[in-house]
Amino acid sequence: VNLLSKFSQLIILIAIAFGISILPIILYTQFTHISIHNLDASSLYFYLSIILGSGVIIVYPFFKKNKSKDYSEWSKLLHRMILDNYNISRSLFSLEKKLFKKKIKDDYKDFVIVTGLARAGTTALTNLLFESNKFHSLSYDNMPFVLSVNLWRKVYHPRKNKLKQRAHGDNIMFGYKTIEALEEYFFKVFLRDKFISEQTLNEHEIDNQTYESYLAYQQLINFYNNNSIYLTKNNNIILRYKSLRKHNPDFKILLIFRYPVEQAFSLLNQHKRFSQLHSEDQFALDYMNWLGHHEFGLNHKPFNLSPIDNRKQYDTRSINYWLTLWISYHAKILTLIDDKNLHLIEYADLCNKPNELLSKIGVELNLDLKTEQPKEPYKKESNLPEMNINPKLMEQSEWIYNELTKYKLII
């Protein structure tokens, strides 16, 4: 174990050193607009940029003003080197599979995905499930080596787990050990962002090799090699839902939905909030891009799920824009409700009766789910203000909402 720990530290240090060594070259290509394949190593400017770039790497953290309070400049540099370089992450994943191959079983197929349109309560639901101690999942202390969590675990041991409120301003607290929606980085790396276009996120297929790697990835995250089940929150699953089902009809999806105008208003507020944050903090914007979070903010990209795209009629600062997104997403869900392993959950039930809901989900998953202490009802957001809502959108969204409630888990 000692030898493996030292070897893991060596591998991580090599990855970091490699990332640092290529940064000046990347800097050179950025300023000269020359592709990395067409570099002229005989040019004086090439060597000057390497020398200056290397110096910048050393002094940069001492002179750059840190706008991201949660990350030091060195930490941000490490995130950029690893998350922004898919080849490094994928190579580390391949190494991780070889070093920890005993974790990977051929007959593995059971896992649980929590999903929904953003601001539906997916984070609260995922945290509630995780507190039952029946699951394993990714957490903040896996960053930025999200695809080589065991190697990183040999090196990185955060001792403090001080909780702070997340950037959403919704009183949800997080720390190093808090689970988070990080697995989308896996799909970004293995699919080379092919599902991300300039303006939208698009439906796509998962080939067999990628799916098998995904199953291996889930098992590698089980640090304690126990019988826990992989749990993730991933709001982008809708983009590959049908493809994943072709590979595996048995995994469970818990999809949470919320009253349309409430959710649209929450999305609008978060879009304003994160647009401001992203305009002030480039790292915050890069962070969201690396992890595939395009729900709101300056990097917002909607799901391309409907041939009729009414959202183009509205500005993103309009409640009607977000209501059209709600309609498009949940109309798609109505086409999937025949799936016996898709379980619909209403946000109001999560807020009002979390313990009863957890127990009911346990019945559906054939698990005894309960927390150590009963959960208090969640505080819902305050009443909505007067808004200029398109009555046709209101009518359409409420019809879809009423249809969804017919298929939800009854508690």
Predicted features and spans:
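Membrane-interfacial hairpin junctions
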Residues: 29-42
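PAPS-dependent sulfotransferases, especially Golgi type II membrane carbohydrate sulfotransferases
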Residues: 54, 62-106, 268, 275-411
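PAPS-dependent sulfation machinery
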Residues: 141-231, 300-302
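Conserved phosphate-donor/acceptor-positioning beta-strand/loop module used by diverse small-molecule
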Residues: 233-234, 244-269
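Juxtamembrane interface helix immediately N-terminal to a transmembrane segment
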Residues: 1-18
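Hydrophobic anchor at the beta1->P-loop junction of P-loop NTPases
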Residues: 114
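A conserved segment at the C-terminal end of the G1
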Residues: 124-134
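Canonical hydrophobic alpha-helical transmembrane segment
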Residues: 43-59
